[in-house]
Amino acid sequence: MSPKTETKASVGFKAGVKDYRLTYYTPEYQTKDTDILAAFRVTPQPGVPPEEAGAAVAAESSTGTWTTVWTDGLTSLDRYKGRCYDIEAVPGEESQFIAYVAYPLDLFEEGSVTNLFTSIVGNVFGFKALRALRLEDLRIPPAYSKTFQGPPHGIQVERDKLNKYGRPLLGCTIKPKLGLSAKNYGRAVYECLRGGLDFTKDDENVNSQPFMRWRDRFVFCAEALYKAQAETGEIKGHYLNATAGTCEEMMKRAVFARELGVPIVMHDYLTGGFTANTSLAHYCRDNGLLLHIHRAMHAVIDRQRNHGMHFRVLAKALRMSGGDHIHAGTVVGKLEGERDVTLGFVDLLRDDFIEKDRSRGIYFTQDWVSMPGVLPVASGGIHVWHMPALTEIFGDDSVLQFGGGTLGHPWGNAPGAVANRVALEACVQARNEGRDLAREGNEVIREATKWSPELAAACEVWKEIKFEFDTIDYL
């Protein structure tokens, strides 16, 4: 045996494989205020003990690998390793449990959601000892969240920019989402904004296709919103989608939007990536642009109960990366979203301090300190009959977005916008008068139809439309 090898042995190095739980399962550990905490739903392979599976998650998402390495002796493993500090059973699920893992703050680069996710969810989800793994929640300590800019402006600054208070904001996604020329697209934008909406929106997959290049769309939409502003006396906006194939092209589109003087741009933050999104958010704050965020691709990640990542984690990540709006489900429309769960992550988007509440899926108390909030956007299969429920569920600090529920009006786009604006104003007035929208909502809408033929026509068209399917993701 060489002297060098003897030296390794003398400091305790022993080659081979040992159980993760011997190093990474530490039920006696007391979490620190600076730790990033994670709650994983773990489904181990048959024969793998819960402690070993939880420890494996902690190891493979922090400092561990499959075998002992002698370079462990060159650092302080106790300082840098993740620790599985608690395990609890999942009620009604014999083969699942929640593993709580604490990560030291020094494992993560400051101000980088990309690095945070690369570490915590980047590799461990393919681990063979696990049948399935889902990240249910993260606790982001102020010591880490303060390294992020967060939303470019936030809720209060947006209201001040728009001079609109005391009600939800109204939007509309232009349909058909693909195939319109830039001029016809701009026409639809103008008609919707003139009819009473606050915003119109590019759909998530409208970028720069052969039928409508981005620069043409930006110019016609800017012309449309300025014309609508002049005619209505209200500040209007259109979410110009700056998402592109490269960060450089994305920034070029955002710069052109700023030169046009429009108030807001848009980004698909999951398909575009967190690095690109954070860069765009920084540009938007520096240049006075609001930033609307679409969550295209989220259901690939978050829809299955046993594997992936819950949207509340993606919502927290977006608040750190930066966005002033984000789509958050509707509860009542065509897209997935259970009420208590949805309201849980809506609070995580908007509020400064959110208490732990397992009944709403919130595993940790979250303190955002001074980070601005994000407006949740309710969009997808909603129409005027949903307005009372949406107003009651989401409150004033939200954006209610009707695509087909505006453009599908039998009289055209502008009457569709009028119908939605009248319905919203009626619901807000009824709520302010003390009426119970959950119980009296339909009556409130019927009363408003007496004064608005546009609303009456909309109510007739969509009176039988419902999306009644069981939610997949429930508590």
UniProtKB/Swiss-Prot annotation:
List the residue(s) that the UniProt entry marks as the site Transition state stabilizer.
334
Name assigned to this protein: Ribulose bisphosphate carboxylase large chain
What positions are modified (N6,N6,N6-trimethyllysine)? 14
Its biological purpose is as follows:
RuBisCO catalyzes two reactions: the carboxylation of D-ribulose 1,5-bisphosphate, the primary event in carbon dioxide fixation, as well as the oxidative fragmentation of the pentose substrate in the photorespiration process. Both reactions occur simultaneously and in competition at the same active site.
Q: What is its main location?
A: plastid
Identify one Pfam family in the record.
RuBisCO_large
Q: What is the active site of this protein?
A: 175, 294
Comment on bound cofactor: Binds 1 Mg(2+) ion per subunit.
- Keyword Disulfide bond assigned: yes
